Amino acid sequence: FLSVLYAQKNQAASTYQLRCCLRDIAVIELLFATGMRISELCSLRPSDIDLENNTVLIYGKGSKERILQLGNPEVICALMLYQDSFKTDISVCGYFFVNKQKHKLSDQSVRFMINRYANLAGIEQHITPHIFRHSFATLLLEQDVDIRYIQEMLGHSSISTTEIYTHVSSAKQKDILVNKHPRN
């Protein structure tokens, strides 16, 4: 999926296409790196993205704030390239992610963007922004991250909400039962 976005960037025939690709890459990278909700992503203000300290301030449901650290250099680079390319538009709009009319990027635009790249990648499964959130949580759980940390990163007030996102894959389940069961 990401390889298609980067290929589109490398094949961009115009400055406009390049800028769109830079924005789309930044959006997808940030969704996957943070597990944030699409509404949280679209509501980000320029001051919420701190690329000196590599943090994102997210305003979640119920006006709950959380700060997430960006640890992946590719995500940080994607955000820097986007920010440099859209600096004027971001300033005019007041939101970090901007559409071609220099307005706040909408939830629907992000959904359309994801569908477009999924089609280009030949992915037949319906891909939604929520899948990035689910994958974020599941992959962290599979790396043995405590579910309470995942709960905090996702902005859930209840651990039971987090548990919905974190189904254990069959491969991980097998590994646990074979290697960690007290009778083995």
What are these regions (language model features)?
Residues 1-184:
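Conserved catalytic core of the tyrosine transesterase superfamily
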